[in-house]
Amino acid sequence: MTHISNNRPRIAVIGGGIAGLTVAASLLRAGIECTVYEQATVFADAGAGIQIAPNSARILHRLGLAGALERRATRAHAIETRRWQDGAPLARTELGEPCVERYGAPYYLIQRADLHRSLLELLPPGVVRHSAACTAVEERPDGVTLRFADGTSEEAGVVVGADGIHSALRNHLVGDRPRFSGHTVHRGLVAADRLPSLFEVPKVLFWLGPNGHVTSYPIAQHGLVHFSAVITSPEWDPEVWSAPSRPGEAAAAFAGWNAEVAELIGAAEQAHHWALFDRDCVGGWSTGRMTLAGDAAHPMVPYLSQGANQAIEDAWVLADLLGAADLDPGPALRRYEELRLPRVREVHRRSRERGHEFHLPDGPQQRLRDRSMPTAERLDDYAWIYGFEAAPVGSR
């Protein structure tokens, strides 16, 4: 059992999603007391799939989740990219054992709720407080007061905002607004037995086409297949973030695509339609006693499948630095932002670029992209992501 030091300031984590729970688990492992304040009354026991790449899988293993991931997740054998019209192969990235040998961990496919449950199991009872919507923070030289929607307040030595792209703490610290990317996504789950030939071997499939792309992979423990169908949508009500997909809406958006895509989308009993937002990747989200993590700090479009992975990296680096800090957390929080900002800026930039590349209309640029893909999508080409070691101090 990790010894909790009484000499360090208690940390309040706002938000109990993947980012918040990983921050809490990492802090506790570093011997730092923390409380997670979650606005929901209960955690949802559902959700779409999520890809856990080796860069964050190694961290989850260090936190003690190797067994849970092997039980609840699927190891992907490959990432395959295909053409929208006829399903012709464009590229294949070998994963499986080559990935473990090269990067020290598998590439996992898991339902978001299962990863969330696994992280929650690392936390002692009482660490997470539900129905705790933080509405305001007041920072002082010696601490922070948190005020909640029910009129109560709490004191903390440090506050970490892990409350997602809608982050109230982000609004307090930075003051910018989310930016609509021009893309929306239909996400859904399909019973795997309705697609028997598509995933005989567990893998991630991409189909690229004009103004859109489709991603799909199995979530084997539940006998499900996840899909995300992204389309260019110049117009979207900025006040609406998501809504149930109307019957036939996703199928109509991808009419004319190959039979595999039609079968996949057509097999979904229900889907949800989301607008994809991000923000410019700017700094200034750390003060002497407050900072951000995950989408609150650096929301990004999902075209490198790195959003949650970067949140997990954030958590490990932040806890590593605070675990080595003295009673003044300010230098550790500033160093955390200094270390993370170049990394997340690069992932953020390349994610935006990849969205443009994925959606090229048929023509000279698309043909150039397709010709270059076999030599640009090899396992070694992802070393900058998968091989990144998020451990600045190395004390753990």
UniProtKB/Swiss-Prot annotation:
Family, similarity comment: Belongs to the 6-hydroxynicotinate 3-monooxygenase family.
Organism of derivation: Streptomyces platensis
EC number: 1.14.13.249
Catalysed reactions listed for this entry: 3-amino-4-hydroxybenzoate + NADPH + O2 + H(+) = 3-amino-2,4-dihydroxybenzoate + NADP(+) + H2O
Cofactor note as given: Binds 1 FAD molecule per subunit.
Name this polypeptide is given: 3-amino-4-hydroxybenzoate 2-monooxygenase PtmB3
GO biological process assignments: antibiotic biosynthetic process
Keyword Cell cycle on entry: no
Summary of the function given for this chain in its UniProt record: Part of a gene cluster involved in the biosynthesis of thioplatensimycin (thioPTM) and platensimycin (PTM), potent and selective inhibitors of bacterial and mammalian fatty acid synthases. Catalyzes the hydroxylation of 3-amino-4-hydroxybenzoate (3,4-AHBA) to 3-amino-2,4-dihydroxybenzoate (3,2,4-ADHBA).
Gene name of the record: PtmB3
Annotated InterPro entries: FAD-bd (IPR002938), FAD-dep_Monooxygenase_BioMet (IPR050493), FAD/NAD-bd_sf (IPR036188)
Disordered: region residues: 352-371
MF terms in GO: FAD binding; monooxygenase activity
Disulfide-linked positions: none
Keywords assigned by UniProt, alphabetized: Antibiotic biosynthesis, FAD, Flavoprotein, Monooxygenase, NADP, Oxidoreductase
Gene3D superfamilies per record: FAD/NAD(P)-binding domain
Source superkingdom: Bacteria
Pathway stated in the Swiss-Prot or TrEMBL entry: Antibiotic biosynthesis
Keyword Cell membrane found: no
